[in-house]
Amino acid sequence: MTFEQCEQEVKRHLTDKRFFHSQCVAAEAARLAQRYGADVEKARLAGILHDIMKDTPPEQQLKILRDSGIILTKTQSRNRKLWHALAGAAYLRGALSVSDEEIVSAVAC
């Protein structure tokens, strides 16, 4: 997916405020990647995608995790604020067919 396609997908899932936050993260990730010699486009993509599931209801996040075969640890199960990162990574793999593990891993963290 291109950055623009990812951006449109993210926009569908987030509030305007959180979408703006993701745009800012993408810009800062690209700046840091440029400075430290990392892949600028991958950093930008990971930045825009990092919170794609943040505004998704917890029940739907949990369904995405279960449907993806992800088993949460006890600590993860008790802390719903952790779910969006793992659900986001699963969503990228499943719904968006993102296969770049560096991007998926960055979203999962």
Where in the sequence are the language-model features?
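Generic N-terminal amphipathic, Lys/Arg-enriched alpha-helix
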Residues: 1-15
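Divalent metal-dependent catalytic cores for phosphoryl transfer on phosphate-bearing substrates
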Residues: 8-12, 35-109
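N-terminal glycine-rich anion-binding loops that anchor highly charged ligand groups
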Residues: 20-22
